[in-house]
UniProtKB/Swiss-Prot annotation:
Gene3D superfamilies in UniProt: Bira Bifunctional Protein, Domain 2
Name the record gives this protein: Phenylalanine--tRNA ligase alpha subunit
Cellular location(s): Cytoplasm
GO molecular function: ATP binding; magnesium ion binding; phenylalanine-tRNA ligase activity; tRNA binding
Naturally occurring in which organism (per UniProt): Nocardia farcinica (strain IFM 10152)
Alphabetical list of PANTHER family matching this protein: PHENYLALANINE--TRNA LIGASE, MITOCHONDRIAL, PHENYLALANYL-TRNA SYNTHETASE
Pfam families cross-referenced by the UniProt entry: Phe_tRNA-synt_N, tRNA-synt_2d
Cofactor: how bound: Binds 2 magnesium ions per tetramer.
Amino acid sequence: MDLSEEALAAAAADAEKAFAAAADLDALAVAKTEHLGGKAPLALAQRALGALPKEEKKDAGKRVNVARGRVAEAFEARRAVLLAERDAAVLVAEAIDVTLPARRQQVGARHPITVISERIADVFVAMGWEVAEGPEVETEHFNFDALNFLPDHPARTMQDTFHIAPEGSRQVLRTHTSPVQVRSMLERDLPIYVVCPGRTFRTDELDATHTPVFSQVEGLAVDKGLTMAHLRGTLDAFARALFGPETRTRMRPNYFPFTEPSAEVDVWFPDKKGGAGWVEWGGCGMVNPKVLIASGIDPEVYSGFAFGMGLERTLQFRNGIPDMRDIVEGDVRFTLPFGIQS
């Protein structure tokens, strides 16, 4: 192996030419193997040093190291250039044209049931009432017994109520938010003024006017000397706050096991065609003395009134929604306008 300065310089020059000719990093890697790898001329020269006489080895070693350093420096310089070219090409390929119009961000909206539920809560909180909540999985005691439903009442059957397994657990998915009223009477100090919004469940098929999961809001007032006049005044104020100052209400006799006397409440409401008419809204009445007793309240001292209505039903005639399925199917094209208007 020729270890002369001329031979080593020639090997280094060949390596520099090969590196300079490399058009990309892959080609540079091939050139590196040829000129800096284990079988490269300078690598062979390094191994040949061992065969030299001692007096020649020192000078030859210096020449080899100088040549190898020259080659390594040329490699790193070319590699830096190719890396910069690659990064520049990536920047060009992935460049963002900041002059293009930005994509409009989609704005979300709260669900209309949430909007109207909060609106109703605000109405009653402004009147000094409190918001009460309760569990959606209820016992039959709170859902039926304490509300004066007889043991053979049809509402208790599998055809109307979702019963929780195992059979005989006496647990159900609540069919109304009335259990929250009973819990409020047991847990709160008198007098009581609470509004109870929440989800309820019944074995209805989903169609234009029914859904198996729906929302209700109920109100309960228990105090000394309350009468139907107080109930009527409360419903009038509620209706005007929710539907507008021209809204009127009326009551029609009805029957509910948990109120006595009981009534249906209708509202006189303008329709989308410019007319107006009576629309059934919900149920109401004076709290049945049996319900007060079941809740630990003396009906000789206290009286109470209660009312309840479905939120989906309220939305339907308040906003002119013909099909209840639109409310529950979660289409953002339907819900967005309600969130904006809230």
